[in-house]
């Protein structure tokens, strides 16, 4: 009973709630990077909740109202950066409650020869809608 009151008062789970929530909420982040590296926009779109918000390095805000607006132009990323793949370097849960989790995400980008050319810190907000976790918003210093 006391633990339940602590959760209600603080919004932070105690005991076994945090690890299970963390792994469930992290799953769409892992799936996003798998889809991104596979250059699979359909799979990538399924990891997101809509409207989806992305804030880029220049402070520009993209809002995708639904999956038809979402996606990544992989050809442009390859042309502009020489991108071949990305790695998910660390994912740290910073805040959470039953419907929203904030993650600090660090990822790197690599060229085809395996050279890492960029590492970015970012904030990802993952939400639970109708029992399904999805990435609702991302803010990073990546272009």
Walk through the language-model features, giving the residues of each.
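A solvent-exposed, acidic/Ser-Thr-rich amphipathic alpha-helical stretch
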Residues: 41-91
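Short, cysteine-centered beta-strand-loop-beta hairpins and adjacent loop/turn segments enriched
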Residues: 109-117
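Short, low-complexity N-terminal intrinsically disordered segments enriched in polar/charged residues
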Residues: 8-46, 50, 67-68
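A short, structured loop/turn motif at beta-sheet edges
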Residues: 93-101, 126-133
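Hydrophobic/aromatic beta-strand elements that line small-molecule binding cavities or substrate pockets
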Residues: 88-94, 107-109, 121-127
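Generic short beta-strand segments
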Residues: 51-53, 104-110
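A short hydrophobic beta-strand element
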Residues: 85, 99-107
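Short beta-strand edge/turn micro-motifs at domain boundaries
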Residues: 117-143
């Amino acid at each position: 009973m006391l633990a339940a009151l602590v959760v209600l008062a603080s919004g932070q789970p105690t005991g076994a709630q945090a690890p299970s929530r963390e792994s469930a909420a992290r799953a769409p982040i892992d799936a996003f990077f798998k889809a991104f590296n596979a250059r699979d926009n359909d799979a990538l779109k399924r990891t997101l909740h809509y409207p989806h918000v992305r804030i880029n390095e220049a402070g520009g805000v993209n809002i995708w109202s639904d999956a038809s607006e979402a996606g990544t132009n992989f050809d442009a990323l390859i042309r502009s950066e020489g991108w071949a793949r990305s790695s998910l370097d660390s994912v740290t849960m910073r805040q959470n409650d039953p419907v929203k989790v904030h993650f600090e995400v660090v990822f790197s980008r690599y060229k085809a020869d395996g050279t890492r050319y960029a590492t970015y810190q970012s904030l990802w907000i993952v939400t639970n809608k109708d029992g399904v976790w999805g990435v609702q918003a991302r803010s990073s210093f990546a272009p």
